[in-house]
Amino acid sequence: MSYEEKLAKLITHHSLNLKKGDVVQIKAETSAEPLVKAMYKEIIKLGAYPFLRLFIPESQEYMAKYASDEQLSYLPEFDIKQAEIMTAYIYIDSTINTKSLTNADHSKIALMRKTAMPVREIMNKRELEGKFRWSLCPYPNQSMAQDAEMSLDEYTAFVYEACKLNEDDPIAAWKKVEAEQEAIAKRMTGTKWLHIKGKDTDLKLNVEGRIWENCCGYRNMPDGEVFTSPVENSAEGTILFDIPTTYNGVEAKNVFLRFEKGKVVEARAEKGQDYLHKMLDMDDGSRFAGEIAFGLNDNIKIPTKNILFDEKIGKSMHLAIGASYQEVGGKNISALHWDLIKDMKNGGTVEADGVLVYKDGKHIL
């Protein structure tokens, strides 16, 4: 069975658990055609209704470069209609130029994200009602491999292992992950305060009443994290994110944040500082913490400049600035959701209500 066929089966049968009658949108760059075909075929075989939303690699670049604010603010009615009727959504990450937006007008990128918010709000609402589910998965290419500083063969093998496609039964492998991570989610349930310590890091977060979600392949693929959304006005202290991340193709390195009453009041970065400041000023919610999570996928050991993988790095934590997750109790609304990652292997600790629960990347259960 090919990579495309194995991944299509994993996404449709495990991540989305598609059934006869489901209405499924596949959104992807044209460069992902082989995987799109495999997904389309598998969806039909399940008795569901696939429809395609393919786009050229340059589409966002052209919008940022040539579109007026009026054009960038236009939201087609059919986008709203699709969000209202589809029961499942697959986004295939196959960007052939991950740097295409590096020199774009970032205020225009922010406007595009704001314009699309009504669609995301509809999908979020329907997901909470149990009427909609989604999945994000990768299709390896030269650009992604180059970002990860690997050959295409090496990168494809890396993706295989991260997604457990190298296992005889990938679905069974993810079910095992689900059981292992559930112990962590249960341990964290009921916690009121987290205290995160490490290099240039001393941060407290209130997570009282919030749900800890076990992420084991039902949305993202690859997966491997346990997360929640902190109480919006609770973050106090400092944190250094020593693993580089990219957002809309722009890299930020060694991001340092200081929070007061939940809000970022100081932000520095060794690289990408101006961009960081623009993103923090995107809207009223963009300076608040929307997520705190443990990365648990030990098949992902190094950063690849792709957040789909990097936020799951084993023995790491990540905090997202911007939008929180309603399904776990989050209330922060923003067009921004930027995951920033911290290596916890060497001296990182987490206390839950004063009890040490995590040290050097390992949970103490």
What would you call each of these model-derived segments?
Residues M1-D22, A28-A48, I243-K253, K263-Y275, ...:
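Long alpha-helical, hydrophobic tracts
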Residues M1-G237:
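Active-site bordering "gate/hinge" segments
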Residues S31, T95-N97, N141, T201, ...:
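Short, glycine-/Ser/Thr-/acidic-enriched flexible segments
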Residues Y40-K45, S107, I211-W212, V255-R258, ...:
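Short, solvent-exposed amphipathic alpha-helical segments in soluble enzyme
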Residues I196, R258, V350:
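Short aromatic-centered micro-motifs
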Residues P222-A267:
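Oxyanion-binding "anion nests"
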Residues E266-G330, V350:
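Dual-mode signal for accessory low-complexity, basic/Gly-rich regions
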Residues L336-L365:
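Extended hydrophobic packing segments that form well-structured cores
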